[in-house]
C-alpha cells in the first residue's frame, strides 16, 4: 500500500501511516512532515482508505475496540471512578480473551505508547487483571491466553500499529451513529 501511495519514492516503506497527520494534511494542506503532502489530494486519501479496507478484508483481519460514553459513565456512576482508559483496557482485554478462547489461540497486546507516565496506569491495570482475573475470566485463563503487553512507539513503523491507528475514529463514528468519513472504510 505504501509503495502505491508514494509511487517512485525510495523511502516509501519508511513512511508511517498516521491518521492525525494525514487528516491534517488533507484538511489544512499543512504537515510537520513533508511525506504527508501527498494527502492534500482527496484522491490519495480515498486510495489510502480503500487500500486499508482491502487489506482488512483480504486478510480477514478481526478488529475490536471499545467506546466509553463519558456522559453515561458519569451519570450512572457518579463520584470517583477508574480512569476511562483503564476501564476501556479492561473491556478490550475481556473481549480479546473471548476472541482467543473461541479461536483456540494465544496472543500478546501491542499498544501504541503514550507519553509517560501514560503507559504506567495501563501496564498496572494489565498486571492486576493478569494476577486477579477479570469479571469473566480467571487469572489462570487470562495468563494462559494472553502473553504480555508491550508499548511500542509510532516511529517503530509497525504495520499492525499503523493499521490500528485508523480504527478508533471509524468505530467512534459508528457508535455515535454518524456516517463514515470514507465510504470504503
PLM regions and their residue ranges:
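Phosphate-ester processing/binding pockets and catalytic centers
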Residues: 1-185
Amino acid at each position: 500500500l505504501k509503495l502505491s501511495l508514494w509511487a517512485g519514492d525510495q523511502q516509501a516503506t519508511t513512511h508511517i501511516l498516521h491518521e492525525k497527520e494525514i487528516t491534517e494534511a488533507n484538511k489544512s494542506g499543512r504537515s510537520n512532515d513533508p511525506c504527508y503532502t501527498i494527502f492534500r489530494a482527496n484522491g490519495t486519501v480515498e486510495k489510502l482508505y480503500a487500500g486499508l479496507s482491502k487489506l482488512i478484508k483480504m486478510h480477514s483481519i478481526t478488529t475490536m475496540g471499545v467506546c466509553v460514553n463519558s456522559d453515561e459513565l458519569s451519570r450512572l456512576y457518579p463520584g470517583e471512578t477508574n480512569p476511562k482508559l483503564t476501564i476501556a483496557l479492561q473491556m478490550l482485554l475481556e473481549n480479546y480473551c473471548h476472541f482467543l478462547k473461541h479461536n483456540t489461540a494465544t496472543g500478546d497486546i501491542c499498544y501504541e505508547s503514550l507519553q509517560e507516565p501514560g503507559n504506567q496506569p495501563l501496564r498496572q491495570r494489565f498486571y492486576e487483571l493478569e494476577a486477579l482475573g477479570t469479571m469473566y475470566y480467571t487469572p489462570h485463563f487470562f495468563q494462559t491466553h494472553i502473553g504480555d503487553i508491550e508499548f511500542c512507539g509510532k516511529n517503530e513503523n509497525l504495520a499492525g500499529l499503523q493499521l490500528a491507528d485508523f480504527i478508533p475514529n471509524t468505530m467512534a463514528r459508528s457508535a455515535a451513529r454518524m456516517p463514515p468519513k470514507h465510504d470504503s472504510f
